[in-house]
Amino acid sequence: MTYQEWRQFAEHVLMKNKENDPFLDVKSESVLLLQTVTKRSKASILAFSETVLTEVELQQLAQLLMRRAKGEPIAYILGEKAFWSLSLKVSEHTLIPRPDTEVLVEHALDFAKQRVTSAHVSGELSILDLGTGTGAIALALAAELTPLTQKCGINLNILGVDRIAEAVALAKDNAKQNELKVNFLQSVWFDALNPEIRFDLIVSNPPYIDKNDPHLTQGDVRFEPLSALVAAEEGYADIRHIIEQAPLFLKPQGALLLEHGWQQAEKVRSIFQKNLWHNVATLKDYSGNERVTLGCWR
């Protein structure tokens, strides 16, 4: 079987997944699987489409295709996912980084850069990423802020925490792979942190889905860890906990940025306001949905 013949076969098999994943790109995924097994570039696979696959390659492709046909996310099958400017390892112990979270990174960068150029930073910029998972948010911030802080003679201290030991280990691997200086710690939210430590900025993409949400039975989330998706109180328990506890770990005029569901913004703003946060605002994602809410502490 040639590259071209296998691609056509894989596209036919994967088309059955369209019902559960309407955004599935069967053409791209068939090429990705070929790239993974043959170790050849996309351009090479397309240019030499009549190349015949070996028996070993066909067996490996059959295994990968079977996993994808069952709905397993392509990121888990490949073991990696692009986020921001980074290539990150992923596993079944972590959420798969999504483009919507880059909105959180963008606005966190805006705040951090303003902080660096203001009188609020004295020698160090400290950032905490709660529920870090793959380390995506923390590492993206490190990639962008390291040159700026070095130029300004400021020490950059970024800490990512996660309750899952395997996620912490994976995040450390991603930091090493991308040659970025970020510390990672196993902790249930703030529990394992030094109570004396203070941060300029706290960011988080916490669990925010209600356990009865029908979307949990659709698409990639069927394979992702429920502990990283689902929260009590109809999805608000972890958000509420973070908003209530964050002031204990923030420097004066520090900020908290939280990602949440697109229909949760009003309730999240209310929780911020009831806890006496200032300048509470919600920011939209690339689809125009309210996705990130921030607040500043006095």
Curated annotation (Swiss-Prot):
Q: Name one GO molecular function term.
A: protein-(glutamine-N5) methyltransferase activity
E.C. no: 2.1.1.297
Report the record's Gene Ontology biological process terms: methylation
Q: Which Pfam families match?
A: Methyltransf_31, PrmC_N
Q: Where does S-adenosyl-L-methionine bind?
A: G131, T132, G133, T134, G135, D162, W189, N205
Membrane-traversing stretches: none
Please indicate if the UniProt record lists S-adenosyl-L-methionine as a keyword.
Answer: yes
- Keywords of the record: Methyltransferase, S-adenosyl-L-methionine, Transferase
InterPro entries per the UniProt record, alphabetical: DNA_methylase_N6_adenine_CS (IPR002052), HemK-like (IPR004556), Methyltranfer_dom (IPR025714), N5-glutamine_MTase (IPR050320), PrmC_N (IPR040758), RF_methyltr_PrmC (IPR019874), SAM-dependent_MTases_sf (IPR029063)
Q: Which residues are substrate-binding?
A: N205, P206, P207, Y208
Disulfide bridge positions per record: none
Q: Main role?
A: Methylates the class 1 translation termination release factors RF1/PrfA and RF2/PrfB on the glutamine residue of the universally conserved GGQ motif.
**Family named by the database record:** Belongs to the protein N5-glutamine methyltransferase family. PrmC subfamily.
Protein name, as recorded:
Release factor glutamine methyltransferase
This protein's species is Pasteurella multocida (strain Pm70)
Q: What is the lineage of its organism?
A: Bacteria, Pseudomonadati, Pseudomonadota, Gammaproteobacteria, Pasteurellales
**Gene it is expressed from:** prmC
